[in-house]
Protein backbone atom coordinates (compact mmCIF):
# COMPACT_ATOMS: atom_id res chain seq x y z
CA UNK A 1 0.00 0.00 0.00
CA UNK A 2 1.27 3.48 -0.90
CA UNK A 3 2.38 5.70 1.93
CA UNK A 4 0.00 8.51 2.83
CA UNK A 5 0.62 12.16 2.00
CA UNK A 6 2.43 14.15 4.69
CA UNK A 7 2.04 17.82 5.53
CA UNK A 8 3.97 19.73 8.19
CA UNK A 9 3.07 22.93 10.07
CA UNK A 10 3.05 24.66 13.47
CA UNK A 11 -0.13 25.16 15.54
CA UNK A 12 1.59 27.75 17.77
CA UNK A 13 4.59 30.03 17.74
CA UNK A 14 7.08 32.13 19.69
CA UNK A 15 6.07 35.58 18.45
CA UNK A 16 6.20 39.30 19.20
CA UNK A 17 2.94 38.73 21.10
CA UNK A 18 4.48 35.95 23.21
CA UNK A 19 3.37 32.37 22.68
CA UNK A 20 0.53 32.55 20.17
CA UNK A 21 -1.85 29.64 19.68
CA UNK A 22 -3.95 28.55 16.71
CA UNK A 23 -4.63 25.18 18.36
CA UNK A 24 -8.39 25.53 17.90
CA UNK A 25 -7.78 25.06 14.17
CA UNK A 26 -5.70 21.87 14.38
CA UNK A 27 -8.95 19.97 13.75
CA UNK A 28 -12.13 22.06 14.11
CA UNK A 29 -14.95 20.40 16.03
CA UNK A 30 -17.30 20.41 13.02
CA UNK A 31 -14.81 18.27 11.06
CA UNK A 32 -13.80 16.00 13.93
CA UNK A 33 -14.97 12.49 14.71
CA UNK A 34 -12.48 11.97 17.53
CA UNK A 35 -9.92 14.25 19.21
CA UNK A 36 -7.60 12.61 21.72
CA UNK A 37 -6.04 15.09 24.17
CA UNK A 38 -2.81 13.91 25.75
CA UNK A 39 -2.10 15.02 29.31
CA UNK A 40 0.97 14.49 31.48
CA UNK A 41 4.21 16.24 32.35
CA UNK A 42 7.35 16.74 30.27
CA UNK A 43 9.16 13.56 29.34
CA UNK A 44 6.15 11.25 29.71
CA UNK A 45 6.32 10.31 26.03
CA UNK A 46 3.56 12.39 24.42
CA UNK A 47 5.53 13.16 21.25
CA UNK A 48 6.82 9.58 20.94
CA UNK A 49 3.25 8.36 21.49
CA UNK A 50 2.11 10.43 18.51
CA UNK A 51 5.08 9.45 16.33
CA UNK A 52 4.36 5.73 16.74
CA UNK A 53 0.68 6.10 15.93
CA UNK A 54 1.55 8.31 12.95
CA UNK A 55 4.03 5.73 11.64
CA UNK A 56 1.43 2.97 11.96
CA UNK A 57 -1.37 4.81 10.13
CA UNK A 58 0.82 6.55 7.56
CA UNK A 59 2.19 3.14 6.58
CA UNK A 60 -1.38 2.04 5.91
CA UNK A 61 -1.85 4.83 3.36
CA UNK A 62 -3.50 7.46 5.59
CA UNK A 63 -2.77 11.12 4.87
CA UNK A 64 -1.32 12.87 7.90
CA UNK A 65 -0.62 16.38 9.14
CA UNK A 66 2.24 16.79 11.60
CA UNK A 67 1.86 19.69 14.05
CA UNK A 68 5.39 20.56 15.13
CA UNK A 69 6.37 22.21 18.40
CA UNK A 70 7.87 25.68 17.91
CA UNK A 71 10.04 25.17 21.00
CA UNK A 72 11.39 21.87 19.62
CA UNK A 73 10.60 21.23 15.94
CA UNK A 74 11.68 17.59 16.26
CA UNK A 75 8.74 17.05 18.64
CA UNK A 76 5.04 17.03 17.83
CA UNK A 77 2.29 19.02 19.49
CA UNK A 78 -0.29 17.14 17.45
CA UNK A 79 -1.04 14.84 14.54
CA UNK A 80 -4.12 14.93 12.34
CA UNK A 81 -5.63 12.30 10.04
CA UNK A 82 -7.93 14.48 7.88
CA UNK A 83 -9.68 11.62 6.06
CA UNK A 84 -10.53 9.92 9.34
CA UNK A 85 -11.48 13.13 11.16
CA UNK A 86 -9.09 12.18 13.95
CA UNK A 87 -6.49 14.22 15.82
CA UNK A 88 -4.18 13.59 18.74
CA UNK A 89 -3.10 16.80 20.49
CA UNK A 90 -0.74 17.66 23.33
CA UNK A 91 -3.03 19.42 25.79
CA UNK A 92 -0.40 20.58 28.30
CA UNK A 93 1.11 24.05 28.93
CA UNK A 94 1.71 26.45 27.29
CA UNK A 95 -1.17 25.38 25.02
CA UNK A 96 -3.56 23.94 27.59
CA UNK A 97 -6.47 22.24 25.83
CA UNK A 98 -9.56 20.78 27.49
CA UNK A 99 -12.45 18.85 25.92
CA UNK A 100 -15.10 20.98 24.22
CA UNK A 101 -17.42 18.08 23.41
CA UNK A 102 -16.45 15.47 26.05
CA UNK A 103 -17.20 11.90 25.08
CA UNK A 104 -18.88 12.71 21.79
CA UNK A 105 -15.69 14.04 20.16
CA UNK A 106 -13.01 14.79 22.75
CA UNK A 107 -11.30 12.28 25.00
CA UNK A 108 -8.47 12.76 27.51
CA UNK A 109 -5.58 10.29 27.56
CA UNK A 110 -3.67 10.85 30.81
CA UNK A 111 -0.13 9.49 30.47
CA UNK A 112 0.53 10.79 33.97
CA UNK A 113 -1.23 7.70 35.31
CA UNK A 114 1.84 5.70 34.32
CA UNK A 115 4.41 7.56 36.41
CA UNK A 116 5.84 6.87 39.84
CA UNK A 117 4.45 9.63 42.07
CA UNK A 118 7.00 9.14 44.83
CA UNK A 119 9.98 9.51 42.49
CA UNK A 120 8.62 12.77 41.08
CA UNK A 121 7.70 14.19 44.49
CA UNK A 122 11.29 13.61 45.62
CA UNK A 123 12.37 16.12 42.95
CA UNK A 124 9.64 18.62 43.77
CA UNK A 125 11.93 21.58 44.58
CA UNK A 126 14.13 20.97 41.52
CA UNK A 127 11.07 20.73 39.29
CA UNK A 128 9.64 23.99 40.65
CA UNK A 129 12.97 25.81 40.20
CA UNK A 130 13.53 24.48 36.68
CA UNK A 131 9.97 25.35 35.68
CA UNK A 132 10.50 28.90 36.90
CA UNK A 133 13.81 29.25 35.05
CA UNK A 134 12.28 27.93 31.82
CA UNK A 135 9.39 30.39 32.08
CA UNK A 136 11.75 33.32 32.71
CA UNK A 137 13.85 32.42 29.67
CA UNK A 138 10.82 32.27 27.40
CA UNK A 139 9.57 35.62 28.68
CA UNK A 140 12.99 37.15 27.98
CA UNK A 141 12.97 35.65 24.49
CA UNK A 142 9.55 37.18 23.82
CA UNK A 143 10.84 40.60 24.88
CA UNK A 144 13.73 40.25 22.42
CA UNK A 145 11.30 39.25 19.66
CA UNK A 146 9.04 42.18 20.49
CA UNK A 147 12.02 44.55 20.35
CA UNK A 148 13.11 43.04 17.02
CA UNK A 149 9.61 43.50 15.64
CA UNK A 150 9.56 47.18 16.65
CA UNK A 151 12.66 47.74 14.51
CA UNK A 152 11.20 45.60 11.71
CA UNK A 153 8.11 47.84 11.75
CA UNK A 154 10.26 50.94 11.23
CA UNK A 155 11.49 49.47 7.95
CA UNK A 156 7.87 48.65 7.10
CA UNK A 157 6.99 52.32 7.48
CA UNK A 158 9.87 53.40 5.25
CA UNK A 159 9.07 50.93 2.45
CA UNK A 160 5.37 51.72 2.71
CA UNK A 161 6.13 55.41 2.27
CA UNK A 162 8.20 54.67 -0.86
CA UNK A 163 5.53 52.39 -2.34
CA UNK A 164 3.40 53.27 -5.36
CA UNK A 165 0.18 51.81 -3.99
CA UNK A 166 -1.80 52.74 -7.10
CA UNK A 167 0.27 50.41 -9.31
CA UNK A 168 0.12 47.73 -6.62
CA UNK A 169 -3.69 48.02 -6.52
CA UNK A 170 -3.87 47.28 -10.25
CA UNK A 171 -1.81 44.10 -9.83
CA UNK A 172 -3.89 43.06 -6.82
CA UNK A 173 -7.14 43.49 -8.76
CA UNK A 174 -5.81 41.61 -11.80
CA UNK A 175 -4.62 38.71 -9.62
CA UNK A 176 -7.95 38.41 -7.81
CA UNK A 177 -9.75 38.31 -11.19
CA UNK A 178 -7.33 35.62 -12.39
CA UNK A 179 -7.87 33.36 -9.38
CA UNK A 180 -11.68 33.63 -9.31
CA UNK A 181 -12.53 33.92 -12.99
CA UNK A 182 -16.06 32.62 -13.56
CA UNK A 183 -16.76 31.94 -9.85
CA UNK A 184 -19.72 33.84 -8.43
CA UNK A 185 -20.56 34.96 -4.91
CA UNK A 186 -22.08 32.29 -2.64
CA UNK A 187 -24.87 32.64 -0.09
CA UNK A 188 -22.74 30.59 2.33
CA UNK A 189 -19.43 31.92 3.60
CA UNK A 190 -16.37 29.74 3.20
CA UNK A 191 -14.80 28.08 6.23
CA UNK A 192 -11.34 29.12 7.40
CA UNK A 193 -8.38 27.45 9.07
CA UNK A 194 -5.51 29.34 10.70
CA UNK A 195 -2.02 27.97 11.45
CA UNK A 196 1.71 28.71 11.02
CA UNK A 197 3.94 27.43 8.23
CA UNK A 198 7.06 28.80 9.95
CA UNK A 199 8.30 29.47 13.47
CA UNK A 200 11.08 31.00 15.54
CA UNK A 201 12.62 27.92 17.17
CA UNK A 202 15.76 26.82 19.05
CA UNK A 203 17.06 25.74 15.63
CA UNK A 204 16.50 29.22 14.19
CA UNK A 205 13.83 30.11 11.63
CA UNK A 206 12.17 26.89 10.47
CA UNK A 207 9.47 26.55 7.81
CA UNK A 208 7.60 23.66 6.19
CA UNK A 209 6.37 25.45 3.08
CA UNK A 210 7.64 22.74 0.75
CA UNK A 211 5.11 20.30 2.24
CA UNK A 212 2.24 22.80 1.95
CA UNK A 213 2.68 24.65 -1.35
CA UNK A 214 1.89 21.65 -3.56
CA UNK A 215 -1.03 22.98 -5.60
CA UNK A 216 -1.14 23.18 -9.38
CA UNK A 217 -1.37 26.99 -9.33
CA UNK A 218 1.42 28.60 -7.27
CA UNK A 219 1.49 32.39 -6.99
CA UNK A 220 4.73 33.59 -5.38
CA UNK A 221 4.88 37.12 -3.95
CA UNK A 222 8.12 38.98 -3.34
CA UNK A 223 8.56 42.30 -1.62
CA UNK A 224 10.14 44.09 1.33
CA UNK A 225 8.09 44.62 4.50
CA UNK A 226 5.51 47.35 3.93
CA UNK A 227 5.19 46.84 0.17
CA UNK A 228 1.74 45.28 0.57
CA UNK A 229 2.15 41.58 -0.20
CA UNK A 230 -0.25 40.78 2.64
CA UNK A 231 -2.89 43.06 1.10
CA UNK A 232 -3.04 40.87 -1.98
CA UNK A 233 -3.32 37.67 0.07
CA UNK A 234 -6.01 39.20 2.29
CA UNK A 235 -8.00 40.31 -0.77
CA UNK A 236 -7.84 36.82 -2.24
CA UNK A 237 -8.89 35.27 1.07
CA UNK A 238 -11.84 37.64 1.40
CA UNK A 239 -12.92 36.86 -2.16
CA UNK A 240 -12.63 33.12 -1.47
CA UNK A 241 -14.77 33.39 1.66
CA UNK A 242 -17.42 35.35 -0.28
CA UNK A 243 -17.51 32.52 -2.81
CA UNK A 244 -18.02 29.86 -0.15
CA UNK A 245 -14.54 28.38 -0.55
CA UNK A 246 -12.53 26.77 2.24
CA UNK A 247 -9.17 28.46 2.91
CA UNK A 248 -6.07 27.63 4.91
CA UNK A 249 -4.26 30.72 6.21
CA UNK A 250 -0.68 30.64 7.47
CA UNK A 251 0.67 33.54 9.48
CA UNK A 252 3.96 35.35 10.06
CA UNK A 253 6.17 33.83 12.76
CA UNK A 254 7.05 37.34 13.93
CA UNK A 255 3.59 38.94 13.76
CA UNK A 256 1.00 36.17 14.24
CA UNK A 257 -1.89 38.16 12.79
CA UNK A 258 -0.12 39.02 9.53
CA UNK A 259 -1.19 36.71 6.72
CA UNK A 260 1.73 35.32 4.68
CA UNK A 261 0.51 32.23 2.86
CA UNK A 262 -2.89 31.06 1.65
CA UNK A 263 -4.13 27.77 0.19
CA UNK A 264 -7.49 27.30 -1.53
CA UNK A 265 -7.72 23.50 -1.95
CA UNK A 266 -10.91 23.51 -4.06
CA UNK A 267 -9.22 25.71 -6.69
CA UNK A 268 -5.84 23.97 -6.34
CA UNK A 269 -4.28 27.41 -5.75
CA UNK A 270 -1.60 28.63 -3.33
CA UNK A 271 -0.37 32.16 -2.71
CA UNK A 272 2.92 32.32 -0.83
CA UNK A 273 5.25 35.09 0.30
CA UNK A 274 8.94 34.57 -0.46
CA UNK A 275 11.64 36.60 1.30
CA UNK A 276 14.99 36.29 3.06
CA UNK A 277 13.34 34.66 6.10
CA UNK A 278 11.29 31.97 4.36
CA UNK A 279 11.06 30.65 0.84
CA UNK A 280 8.93 27.92 -0.70
CA UNK A 281 11.17 25.84 -2.93
CA UNK A 282 8.60 25.62 -5.72
CA UNK A 283 8.38 26.70 -9.34
CA UNK A 284 5.82 29.54 -9.52
CA UNK A 285 3.09 29.66 -12.11
CA UNK A 286 2.97 33.42 -11.44
CA UNK A 287 5.54 35.59 -9.65
CA UNK A 288 4.82 39.15 -8.53
CA UNK A 289 7.59 41.39 -7.18
CA UNK A 290 6.15 44.33 -5.23
CA UNK A 291 9.63 45.86 -4.97
CA UNK A 292 9.19 46.96 -8.58
CA UNK A 293 6.74 49.60 -7.33
CA UNK A 294 9.20 51.21 -4.87
CA UNK A 295 10.54 54.73 -5.37
CA UNK A 296 14.30 54.12 -5.34
CA UNK A 297 15.14 57.82 -4.89
CA UNK A 298 13.12 57.91 -1.69
CA UNK A 299 14.69 54.66 -0.46
CA UNK A 300 18.15 56.14 -1.01
CA UNK A 301 17.25 58.91 1.45
CA UNK A 302 16.63 56.26 4.13
CA UNK A 303 19.44 53.92 3.15
CA UNK A 304 21.31 54.39 6.44
CA UNK A 305 18.16 53.82 8.53
CA UNK A 306 17.08 50.65 6.72
CA UNK A 307 20.61 49.23 6.91
CA UNK A 308 20.80 49.97 10.65
CA UNK A 309 17.34 48.51 11.25
CA UNK A 310 18.15 45.31 9.38
CA UNK A 311 21.35 44.79 11.36
CA UNK A 312 19.73 45.47 14.75
CA UNK A 313 16.75 43.28 13.86
CA UNK A 314 19.02 40.34 13.08
CA UNK A 315 20.98 40.90 16.31
CA UNK A 316 17.85 40.89 18.46
CA UNK A 317 16.28 37.96 16.64
CA UNK A 318 19.44 35.89 17.01
CA UNK A 319 19.52 36.76 20.70
CA UNK A 320 15.91 35.60 21.01
CA UNK A 321 16.78 32.32 19.29
CA UNK A 322 19.73 31.79 21.64
CA UNK A 323 17.46 32.41 24.63
CA UNK A 324 14.90 29.91 23.31
CA UNK A 325 17.77 27.43 22.99
CA UNK A 326 18.55 28.01 26.68
CA UNK A 327 14.88 27.49 27.52
CA UNK A 328 14.90 24.18 25.64
CA UNK A 329 17.96 23.06 27.61
CA UNK A 330 16.08 23.79 30.82
CA UNK A 331 13.03 21.94 29.50
CA UNK A 332 15.24 18.95 28.70
CA UNK A 333 16.51 19.14 32.28
CA UNK A 334 12.90 19.15 33.47
CA UNK A 335 12.19 16.01 31.45
CA UNK A 336 15.08 14.26 33.22
CA UNK A 337 13.08 14.31 36.46
CA UNK A 338 10.14 12.49 34.84
CA UNK A 339 11.71 10.00 32.42
CA UNK A 340 13.25 7.70 35.09
CA UNK A 341 9.91 7.60 36.88
CA UNK A 342 7.80 6.57 33.87
CA UNK A 343 6.48 3.08 33.16
CA UNK A 344 6.98 3.23 29.40
CA UNK A 345 5.83 -0.34 28.87
CA UNK A 346 2.37 0.74 30.05
CA UNK A 347 2.55 3.83 27.83
CA UNK A 348 3.31 1.52 24.88
CA UNK A 349 0.32 -0.68 25.71
CA UNK A 350 -1.88 2.42 25.76
CA UNK A 351 -0.44 3.55 22.42
CA UNK A 352 -1.04 0.13 20.85
CA UNK A 353 -4.63 0.12 22.07
CA UNK A 354 -5.25 3.58 20.60
CA UNK A 355 -3.72 2.48 17.29
CA UNK A 356 -6.10 -0.50 17.13
CA UNK A 357 -9.07 1.77 17.77
CA UNK A 358 -8.03 4.16 15.03
Tell what function each PLM region has.
Residues 126-179, 308, 312-351:
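An accessory alpha-helical subdomain
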Amino acid sequence: MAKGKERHMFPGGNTSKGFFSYYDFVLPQEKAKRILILKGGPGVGKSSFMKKIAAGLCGEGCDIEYMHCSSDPASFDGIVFPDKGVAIIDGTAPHIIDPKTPGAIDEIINLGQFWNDEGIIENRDKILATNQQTSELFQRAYRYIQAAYSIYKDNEVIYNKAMNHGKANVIISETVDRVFEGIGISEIEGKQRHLFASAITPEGLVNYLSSLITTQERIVLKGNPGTGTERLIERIRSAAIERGLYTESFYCALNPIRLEHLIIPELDVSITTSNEFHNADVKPTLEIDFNEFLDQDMLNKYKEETKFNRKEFETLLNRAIKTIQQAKEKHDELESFYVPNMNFSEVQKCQEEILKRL
